Amino acid sequence: MSGSGLTVRWSLVGAPDGVEKALADYVAETSHARFTGMEGLRFKTWRMRAGEWFEGCYVFVDDAARAAFQEEFTAVAAEAPGSRIIGSAPILIEECVVVAVAEGGDGFGAAARY
């Protein structure tokens, strides 16, 4: 099993008031559905620290799937929905190796909103 990951991070420093809610709404109403069942993607998580950063963490089936997505996304990153909501392009688009994933006793809980 491959651990081909990608992190995309936006800064929320100086972002408009209400950006955290707008991002959570966008994920719940649009982005979650886009990535659910996506070929080549094992899973994606969306993470945020209010006033600091918002990011997507992706794990792909292999490096080829990650590289293809990364190339496609990087070309339009400045105009991506997250960039439009935040008002700036990502500050980081970085591949990584996911060393391991553990499923807890209560199982994974895929949800459009936590």
Name each model feature, range by range.
Residues 76-84:
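A common structural junction motif
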Residues 1-53, 63-72, 87-114:
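Short S/T/G/P-rich N-terminal loop/turn motif that feeds into the first structured element of a domain
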